[in-house]
Amino acid sequence: SKDGLKVQGWLMKPANFDPSKKYPMVLWIHGGPWSMYSVNWNWAYQNFAANGYAVLWTNPRGSTGYGQDFVNGIQHSYPGKDYDDLMASVDAARDTLHRGLADALIL
């Protein structure tokens, strides 16, 4: 994140991924803030990946599952640090994308 807090996230490559090509990317944001992603199967991610998109999903501050301090990290500041976490995740993914995963101009 912007202030150095580590935030968990996942980046799914498109089907038939070719590292020499660039791909559009979708940032999938969960509802909440009292919610979280975990390791699971999601038809929407699979659908986007099957149609040539990279898919990024994360648990920004305010998400459950990481302790009460993490949940309270957005108290009196919504949106704020949660938004910063999402954008930092996009930046981190974009750094990966520059190595051939996706087109940084189509996010």
Regions inferred by a protein language model and the residue ranges of each:
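Serine-hydrolase catalytic core recognition
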Residues: 1-107
